[in-house]
Amino acid sequence: MGRNRKVVIDRAEEKRGGDELSAILLSIKDPEELALFLDDMLTENEKRDIIQRYLLMDDLWKGKSQRDIASDRAMSLCRITRGSKMLKKKNGFMRRYFSEKYDDFTHI
């Protein structure tokens, strides 16, 4: 008793849950409502992790070196490399987002 057991979900259930979460996110138009949703769904550490991942990707896009990011943000190079790989995905959302944010369609 008292042991944490890993909950297993099958692919169909995972897809259904992902589709429903996507629909919820698309329905939220107000930033305060989005903040409430994220507060309900994520722990403080999970929110911090997402924010850190966004900031490191922003740093990478602006040309900051992985070593400088690791030093400045006290992050592992492994984690930063993962963010770099996301930015290199040809059809990746974050690549498109930063291209539009910085009006730079040839970066990375």
Predicted regions and their residues:
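Short alpha-helical "recognition helix" segments of helix-turn-helix
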Residues: 68-74, 80
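Intrinsically disordered, low-complexity basic tails/linkers immediately adjacent to helix-turn-helix/homeobox/MYB/SANT
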Residues: 97-108
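Short, solvent-exposed alpha-helical "recognition" segments
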Residues: 84-98
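Short, Lys/Arg-enriched anionic-surface-contact patches
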Residues: 32-53
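Short, amphipathic alpha-helical "recognition" segments used to contact nucleic acids or chromatin
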Residues: 50-64
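Short helix-capping/linker segments at secondary-structure and domain boundaries
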Residues: 63-69, 92
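Amphipathic alpha-helical segments within well-ordered protein domains
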Residues: 22, 38-39, 57, 81
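General nucleic-acid-binding
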Residues: 1-28
